[in-house]
Amino acid sequence: LPDIRGSLGATFEEGSWITTAYLVAEIIVIPLTGWLVSAFSMRRVLIVGTTGFLLFSVACSLAPTIGAMIAARALQGAFGGVLIPLSFQLIATELPLSRRPLGMALFAVANNVAQAAGPSIGGWLTDVYSWRWIFYLQIPPGLALLAAIARSIRPQAVHAAGLRNGDWGGIATMALGLSAMQIVLEEGGRRDWFASPFIVQTSILAATSL
């Protein structure tokens, strides 16, 4: 983050939104994933989610300003949010019962290795090349995932009635409440928690919306 802030001429507070914007968008989309799958099918949601994640990874790498970076990160988080719950659903639905424990174990190991190695790899890329390569690095595995989805998951019909019957008011208040809660959790420590009027107001918004 310091290298990105310096390159884009952002303050510390502005730079913190690079992470916050991603997490806010992601936490809104995760609970909506099941509803999206029931309307559009797992295959379509995975393809759109992965494609959008890759496109906005490129947008992040090309961002000329901190505003563009924050917007691209938010959209990257929104598209990437479907990938977390659908990873578990794929293991549960596509693997035979006898192989599901192995699938869960491999997923957990891969996730832990990625989280442990990510900062080191990102730091090395930043030192040797540029912070922009952190986002380029996500493209090859994303393309491999798209190929695997297209090859292995069967197409299914679209059920648009599920969208018409959706509780749009509930979705809006849930999105507002979850985003406010995530902002409180991310920004609270930097703003001295409830000594900050912004954190107090955002906490009230989260409580009333949820």
Name what the model sees in each region.
Residues 127-210:
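Hydrophobic transmembrane-helix bundles of small-molecule transporters
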